[in-house]
Amino acid sequence: MKYNRQKEMLSYIEENKSVRNEELLSRFNISIQTLRRDLKIFEDQGLIEKVYGGVIYNDRRESVSSVSPLEKREQSNSEEKEYIGKLAAALVEDGDVIFIDSGTTAYRMLHYMKDLKNVTVISHCLDVMMEIRRMPNLTGICVGGVIQHDSGTFVVDSSFYPYNYSKAFISTVGISASKSLTNTNLYEGAMKQHVINQSAANYILADHSKFDVIAYNHFADFSLIKAIITDRKPSEKFVNFFESKQIKLMY
């Protein structure tokens, strides 16, 4: 299954540090198109780096670029992410206490929140906090801890942060009818789980490329989600599926 393959592939790359594409194609008996999709998921999360003819594992002990992790991903589907951010921001009301997840899509919300009043934004993402620093109309609370250099987020035992949220805006690597919501970072996944359980309303922010994708870490079931915010109408399969789950689709 896709879920198990991606998990095994990432473990294999981590163990060997550098692997050629031909080796991955042969070992996992997949097409080049499937390999490219899997590697893109890993690359988007900063887990690997692509090199000519193969990949290398992104060991966190290596030096960190002066460019923020969020900035590195800014160019991927940027127009779609901006659109999703605008839709999500329209849901925020004066007086809300919200959680904004890491990721460039959730970050775009802030571009459309300059006129809100008495809104508290809680996040574990350094880039989100740096943007809020320039927005005096918002109160920012940073969920501190140990920083992850590859994602620019802080991780810590989530039980130390028992905040209650009126709304949570969560990013995801994959949306699947069979595996629900998945990502490729166990620490981030644990934070997402905790926030979703503490929030009155949960919104998933995902562009069209995230549908029918299964990453190796499951972090939430659809029963806890109020709406999926995306950039275009998904396939009828997903339209019917979300309707059956009473989840609103916004696009």
What residue ranges belong to the model's regions?
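HTH-adjacent hinge/linker in prokaryotic transcriptional regulators
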Residues: 2-8, 14-22, 27, 33, ...
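Conserved phosphate- and dinucleotide-binding cores of soluble alpha/beta proteins
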Residues: 11, 21, 50, 127-251
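Gly/Ser/Thr-rich loops at beta-strand to alpha-helix junctions
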Residues: 104-107
